[in-house]
């Protein structure tokens, strides 16, 4: 029932054909249950295991590998002799890679969808209802509540369904709905209709929402929505509908896969077509079909060479290592790809309450009257330090610390704060923090009393548990609270009736202490306390006090102000009608104004510096909150999101103002705005959508249930460690210390990780280019195979994989947070860089082919054939005069492939050392800056020697040990790559960067 807040309580009851006294009949309950279903959030039907497995093979790179494996399997069946065993190694290795990749992917997916289930923790297990089958209130399972049920709630209860209030059974009803709306203080509710069809949840003061908590009071309501129809249920539906966005890296790798598949197709077809004339060569027994299959195998080898099989594993490893480094900085990453996405974050949309602020109300200013003579009024103003519930802070007047006990007015102010209060401070020993017990506003007053210490209580030697209420307990020993006149909306105040516990000249007779909204309390004041004496409250003094309060409540502070007053001679309690709350205002008259306190949910002290740092890094910070616009803008000014005098027109919007804009205006508003106030969950998701339409990479922070859909929709969802389980499981990242500063550290780490990823991706790709050039050259020139597929797989996965992973440990650039965010569409390799890595790759390919050719032509242990004979080796037969005296089996020797493989591995190790920096010379940034890289190079070379020397590996990889002279040739062909890359780096530094600057 969407419009329940618009109707009177009687109209809502009529709609459901129910009375508040009798409740629903059993027939009505049965009908409603059939119509609306159970009052619970349905269990999410996740994807089946089979669906998840199939999904892992939708990636283009994976499909290319799968095709290569299937073709290799088919070809392996036709192998004969010694090659039969080794032929199956290649497809088996590829399949093992794909299976491992799928297992990791399925495991991640299984964990990712837990957010929806976490919402269930906000569903209360039991509820209290009135039904016609039994007298009075009965407890039933919350899932059995149906629309139309009369539900009773009291302090401490979790609201079991969305309720329209019909009767408040206490003087006031306050509800903590911060998990749903993000409001930092509990909200006073009433039963009146709200004639505003566009009211947001924060303005629906006659509604109680499922999953929120009753802070004080007792009430009856009629259930108007259950299950998925509740506001909590709508959030669940939004979360279920959100499709996870692919990260910039995933999109780039998809694009890379598409380009690679096209390139592979062209090259493979070209190699096969070029060699059609050789299909019937004697080496194939004159069979055209056998020749076609032979060259098809070479085309498959090309495909294997072109695919960087090790890339998925190396990227996963690098991101996993990055998450460990981030965890040490209090940023726990749940989704691996989001580590890289952090590096291109351009907008951080931050929830205010508990993220930019502490979510711990704190009194930061107070005043008492110093002078109130005819025509003049002077105030004693004080500031109080401390931004949490920790009872430590300093009271200052101007710049000077003061002893509060020296001011009679402050002693009385502290007395009112301590006694006119139903809340307390508590030290949570498990968490090691001070927490509120009761109302946030009243807890702030309790904390203020502890900081003021007006009776100079000796606090040394107290445990933290004892310290939580030491100063308050001293005041409570002097006066005893007899009863409380609860807060009500009409008088906007509450009061306590207190009597002295013992005869004391300072305390004479019973008193009433009052606190409430300044305008309402001051209106009922006839005098003002000046020190220890009482003076009449003149019009001048009244205006002066109200002007100061208005000043605090607006401008850069927007403090929540409370006036504190005393009734020195209250009526006798026997003469007071305490069961009639309409008379309370009569008892709270003829008051003496004592002072005023100003409080706020204070900004975290470290946030302002972080926002400045974000600004320097080209990242826009946008505050999104459920609080009112004035408070939100004031906090923005304190944090530096807005300047002190900056005009916020077009930069700050309420949810309603945002709704009033056309879709295009909403898009433009999201492009410029830095503050959104009074928003609902749907607004947050729309803001993220609009930002994404401008290709902004959005990080959304939050801690409440209301943040979860937007956290899931944003590229980076960041939840607070103290936040709700729903927010945490919808997010990609959780801040264990709830500190906005940790986001900035995580962004810096993300940028460093991306830079390192660029290095190892380019490193791996230059290796693949070299392998493709090698196979393409041997095919075009008609030379024997220099590298076979199983060797290529070994290099791509193992030998190159270790240094590539170690490149993830490269140190970050010093100016990494002084640059704007990189464009998420920026290509991994483009322009000059593409030429650089193509040049390196071509050299790798030429050197590899040259090494194999050298053994045939020049090695004293080789056949020393001519280059012409080598190019026509397929025509070799006993009766061919061109090959007289040459054993044709020499063209199947393992030595040339071993030479080629050794050169490829050695060059790749040199390349890895070159990759410590993209443009800096090895003389400026030597390899030992990354000791992990040196270890990886040593390990890779050790593994290479392993396959050369340890049986049965030489048989599997078709290699053989080399002599010292042969190793000398390998080094001569490999080391020049360092000089080539140094020359290309020199050109980059001195010419290419200058061109960029000119652009």
From Swiss-Prot:
Chain residue ranges for the region called Interaction with phospholamban 1: 370-400
CDD domains to which the protein is assigned, alphabetical: P-type_ATPase_SERCA
Topology feature Cytoplasmic, residues: 1-48, 111-253, 314-757, 809-828, 918-930, 986-999
Single GO molecular function: metal ion binding
A Pfam family recorded for this sequence: Cation_ATPase
Lumenal side: 70-89, 274-295, 778-787, 852-897, 950-964
Gene Ontology biological process terms from the UniProt entry: calcium ion transport from cytosol to endoplasmic reticulum; intracellular calcium ion homeostasis; intrinsic apoptotic signaling pathway in response to endoplasmic reticulum stress
Similarity section: Belongs to the cation transport ATPase (P-type) (TC 3.A.3) family. Type IIA subfamily.
Subunit structure: Interacts with sarcolipin (SLN). Interacts with phospholamban (PLN). Interacts with myoregulin (MRLN). Interacts with DWORF. Interacts with VMP1. Interacts with TUNAR; the interaction occurs at low levels in low glucose conditions and is increased by high glucose levels.
Cited function: This magnesium-dependent enzyme catalyzes the hydrolysis of ATP coupled with the transport of calcium. Transports calcium ions from the cytosol into the sarcoplasmic/endoplasmic reticulum lumen. Contributes to calcium sequestration involved in muscular excitation/contraction.
Protein name from the UniProt record: Sarcoplasmic/endoplasmic reticulum calcium ATPase 3
Organism: Mus musculus (Mouse)
